[in-house]
């Protein structure tokens, strides 16, 4: 999922196991809203938890969402076939057990428990048949539509998903898939209420309209009671939820704001119980000194990406454009960013697929040999190598006598980011790094939803990026960049008339398709390494560090995992 500043595991905790959350309230600790405290307690009512995750979500439609903040809200409102427990183990949710799998591992049979929508109607296997086909339909234009490519197709183009009775699903895959159970736990695979969807959008022109206001039918632990856009959301316990007896928190109040100074002040005043980001200049004060402040591991990569179709590369060959991007990659001082911006022990990244990710064949994908550059070197260590790459792209340099150079012709660009002190600080670090070779970079910050749309549409030269693994398999990182992926912000292979300087992406698309369809898991690992090689050779993706995550949680809030 597109990364803000909250971990996917913590999303599961806040949205799924907040149902098991309890609190022992006390008097709020006194604070001026800016000082770090040893610990603090909540002043919200006993039956409520108040949190901030982000600003206004772009969508809370399970089929359309591809951001973590939207995902958190979706798992409040909806329940799928499977979920994860506090140890990260996959367990049944609306399924009665783990699926029965055929000997050739291509046919999955899932038995369902009886459960209800929030309006009292039964949730049936046909709800999943409808919802999965809707998410996969090109008319829906879901960023994650490709997650259904592993499912075979019927002659009419529909997914080979059949409701053999009201509570049994039969799913036929194109080939064995080691992570299909995890897909069935992912929000894009959640059911939606067909009548709401079709009533709100009878012509199919606005597929997410049905959930743009509170009051829609859902089947999760909570229903959305109120939504003051760009201000707040209130979720209330759903009495029709299949496990309602174990939902002890009656309400979840969400503050919608990307202003980390304001949300941090609200947290310190006791108005918020949980925040997933703090002002960047507060991290060193909090880390190791405040028991509310937590750092957790994560599986994902923070990176910076180029739009390969941007005019900055006009007139260059494919190789020259790649050399320009690779040169700037070498200039990045990752150690500085980790130590002075991230400040929570992130690991500098020398590959796109993150360290620790499984290879899908019983091993770990990234080894000591899997590095594309020396991430420990600072930009000043690699200025000469970067200069040679830019010279090969047609640029000349004049030594300024202070370790920096003037570039001719001049290179100017704008770094696109959302409003967040950490991302802006990363941009400021890049400004200094690129200036070593006379490259001028401005910083443009936008509201979250505007930023997402501009980045997706290719309205940028260089942008901040991040991806948290949706499941523990490298294909999840690599299939982002296929031509038909809605998450391919780098525009690789995209556009009616791709730039002459953009790489031909045909072979990459074929490679990802082969990875998805091969039944030889050892070969699959080799193919995924080839795909990462091809991706990194474009220079369009510049990994900065492998994620961990931070959050603050009131000391008297219990039961969160």
Which residues make up each language-model segment?
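Detector for C-terminal structural segments
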Residues: 331-366, 422-431, 455-561
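Ligand-site clamp/hinge motif
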Residues: 213, 239-285, 440-442
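N-terminal lobe/hinge region of extracytoplasmic solute-binding protein
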Residues: 52-101, 217
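Surface-exposed binding/hinge segments that line
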Residues: 145-199
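Ligand/substrate-recognition segments at binding pockets and active sites
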Residues: 229, 379, 393-469, 521, ...
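Aromatic- and charge-enriched surface segment that lines or borders ligand/interaction sites
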Residues: 96-142, 170, 266, 318-320, ...
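Structural transition elements
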Residues: 5, 348-395, 399, 419-423
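Gly/Pro-rich hinge or "lid" segments in bacterial periplasmic/extracellular proteins
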Residues: 86-89, 185-247, 251, 269, ...
């Amino acid at each position: 999922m597109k990364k803000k500043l909250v971990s996917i595991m913590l999303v599961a905790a806040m949205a799924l196991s907040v149902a098991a959350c309890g609190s022992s309230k006390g008097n709020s600790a006194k604070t001026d809203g800016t000082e770090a405290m040893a610990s603090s307690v909540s002043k919200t009512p006993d039956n409520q938890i108040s949190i901030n995750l982000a600003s206004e979500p772009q969508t809370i439609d399970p089929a359309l969402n591809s951001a973590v903040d939207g995902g958190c809200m979706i798992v409040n409102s909806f329940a799928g076939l499977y979920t994860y427990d506090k140890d990260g183990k996959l367990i049944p949710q609306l399924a009665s057990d783990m699926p029965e799998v055929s000997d050739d591992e291509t046919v999955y049979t899932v038995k369902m428990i009886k459960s209800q929508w929030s309006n009292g109607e039964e949730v049936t296997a046909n709800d999943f048949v409808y919802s999965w086909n809707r998410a996969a339909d090109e008319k829906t234009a879901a960023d994650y539509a490709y997650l259904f490519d592993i499912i075979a197709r019927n002659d009419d183009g529909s997914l080979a998903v059949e409701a053999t009775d009201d509570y049994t699903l039969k799913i036929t895959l194109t080939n064995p898939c080691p992570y299909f159970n995890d897909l069935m736990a992912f929000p894009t695979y959640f059911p939606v209420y067909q009548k709401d969807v079709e009533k709100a959008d009878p012509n199919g022109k606005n597929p997410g309209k049905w959930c743009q206001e509170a009051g829609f039918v859902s089947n999760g632990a909570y229903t959305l009671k109120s939504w003051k856009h760009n201000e707040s959301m209130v979720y209330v316990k759903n009495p029709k939820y299949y496990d309602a007896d174990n939902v002890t928190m009656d309400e979840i109040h969400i503050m919608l704001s990307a202003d980390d100074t304001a949300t941090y002040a609200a947290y310190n005043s006791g108005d918020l119980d949980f925040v997933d980001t703090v002002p960047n200049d507060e991290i060193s004060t909090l880390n190791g000194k405040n028991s509310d402040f937590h750092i957790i591991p994560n599986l994902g990569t923070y990176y910076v990406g180029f739009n390969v179709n941007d005019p900055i590369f006009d007139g260059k060959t494919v190789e020259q454009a790649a050399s320009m991007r690779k040169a700037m990659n070498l200039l990045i001082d990752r150690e500085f960013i980790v130590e002075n911006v991230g400040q929570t022990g992130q690991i500098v990244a020398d590959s796109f697929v993150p360290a620790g990710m499984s290879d899908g064949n019983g091993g770990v994908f990234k080894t000591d040999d899997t590095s594309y550059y020396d991430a420990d070197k600072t930009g000043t260590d690699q200025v000469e190598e970067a200069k040679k790459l830019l010279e090969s792209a047609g640029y000349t340099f004049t030594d300024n006598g202070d370790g920096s150079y003037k570039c001719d012709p001049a290179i100017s660009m704008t770094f696109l980011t959302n409003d967040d002190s950490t991302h802006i600080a990363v941009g400021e670090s890049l400004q200094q790094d690129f200036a070593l070779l006379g490259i001028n970079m401005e910083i443009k910050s936008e509201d979250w939803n505007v930023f997402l749309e501009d980045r997706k549409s290719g309205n940028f030269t260089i942008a901040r990026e991040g991806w948290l693994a949706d499941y523990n398999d490298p294909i999840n990182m690599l299939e982002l960049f296929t031509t038909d992926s809605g998450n391919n912000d780098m525009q690789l292979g995209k556009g009616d008339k791709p730039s002459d300087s953009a790489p031909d992406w045909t072979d990459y698309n074929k490679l990802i398709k082969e990875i998805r369809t091969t039944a030889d898991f050892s070969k699959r690992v080799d193919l995924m390494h080839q795909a990462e090689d091809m991706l990194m050779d474009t220079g369009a993706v510049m990994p900065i560090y492998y994620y961990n995550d931070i959050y603050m949680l009131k000391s008297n809030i219990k039961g969160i995992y």
